[in-house]
Amino acid sequence: MFFFISIAVLLLNIPRDARWAENGITVAGGQEQGSALNQLNRPQGLYVDDDQTVYIADTDNHRIMEWKAGTTSGEVVAGGNGQGNRADQLNTPIDVIVDKETDSIIICDKGNRRVMRWLRRNRTSGEIIIENIYCWGLTMDDQRFLYVSDWGTNEVRRYRMEEKMGTVVAGGNGLGDHLNQLKWPAYIFVDLDHSVYVSDWNNHRVMKWMKDTKEGIVVAGGRGEGNALNQLSSPQGMLVDTLGTIYVAERLSNRVSRWCKGASQGNVIVGGKGKGQQANQLNLPE
């Protein structure tokens, strides 16, 4: 069973004493790897809409899927025309968000090194809004600035919609583990103060960059790769709630951990029982 964390614009209000069931429920896929409408193939980033509709970057099927709550199959809303770089194709899409202002979905089309926008009312083709970027994670703030992580330059950039260049808001000082550097930034989250949280994948940490600062602070992990409670192992999908608590999917530890604000270690809330397909296990969560 795969597990994914939605990277949402809205902060969630999760009680400090919240508890999670040991077993998870499959809401999309789970019918073995494949390309049928009830299947997924290496799904990665996702977005959950207000009505619980889930948009999934179905990476190795080169498409974006829409799964309405309670349904057993999804619908292709972008791509699905084979791997390629035409306007109606995607190449290993890795993240997706919804822009309600324009009623469109924004896609990190990683294999084509571009960010695409597809109008939800026109599912036949999309338009390129950012080019020449080795994108991984996407999010949007409350002022409709778009944030994109770039593996090639080890930075996160903020873009006004329709802007091509953007502004560096995290990293951008080469590959490394100093507080002003990132090493393969993956998924990102922006809070209401416009602080940027970054899953710093190969540094095995989550970084927080407050607005207009030149370096970040470590808010989870940062003690080398490992599965101890004060460590992370290849952090991926991540979100932050209203209390500043961080929830992060750890790919190589096959778990989701929760780090309270200011804590020196986290606690496991999902998985952590080895790699597997049982309802209480995860398999390389991203």
Tell what function each PLM region has.
Residues 68-72, 118-123, 160-164, 210-214, ...:
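Short loop/turn segments that connect beta-strands within beta-propeller blades
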Residues 51, 59, 69, 101, ...:
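Short loop/turn segments immediately following the C-termini of beta-strands
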Residues 55-58, 98, 106-109, 147-149, ...:
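Residue position within the beta-strands of beta-propeller blades
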Residues 26-36, 75-86, 124-129, 168-178, ...:
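A short beta-strand motif characteristic of beta-propeller blades
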Residues 36-51, 86-102, 131-146, 175-196, ...:
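Beta-rich, blade/repeat-based domains predominating
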Residues 10-13, 28-62:
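Beta-strand-rich domains and repeat architectures in extracellular enzymes and scaffolds
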Residues 2-26, 30:
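Blade/loop signatures of beta-propeller domains
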Residues 62-65, 113-116, 154-157, 166, ...:
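Structural signal for beta-propeller blades
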